Amino acid sequence: MANLVVHFEIHASEPQRLVDFYSQLLGWKFTQFGDIPYWTIETGEGAIGNVAGSAGHGINGGLTQRRGPKPEPGAPVMGCNLVVGVDDVDSLMARGTELGGTVARPAEDMQGVGRTGYLLDPDNNVFGMISAVMSDGTIGMGGGES
């Protein structure tokens, strides 16, 4: 293995609230791991670490009980950001706010990359979303058109 990122963790003051948020927003499946406050996260078919065990195009993760206060709104990011590849950044940004998230950075086009946006989940964890399709319908990564 060549130092690949193979797992992520989300810290939660109220785990069930974030299980519901990410399940409804991104369709992720959460399974509690024994009697401890930890849930495995399956992000979808083809993810590294799925039941089939074969490498794919993404990674699975976990959700754990936070051991301390949740981040205050406007606080600098501590740690790493999770960025999720999606089909439509704008619709998921809107859905995320309906589910209790807050816009951390509005959706915008990044020339040559695609469309990105960042939300705070209901526990103030920041995460991003990215799509190759920009607002004008062109493809950022790869330079083609949709």
Where do the protein language model's features map onto the residues?
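N-terminal beta-strand motif that seeds the catalytic metal site of vicinal oxygen chelate
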Residues: 1-20, 24, 79-84, 130-146
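Core segments of cupin and vicinal oxygen chelate
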Residues: 2, 9-58
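Vicinal oxygen chelate
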Residues: 5-13, 42-45, 56, 64-146, ...
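Flexible, glycine-rich phosphate/dinucleotide-binding loops
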Residues: 47, 70, 133-136
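Conserved beta-strand in the GNAT
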Residues: 61-64, 127-128
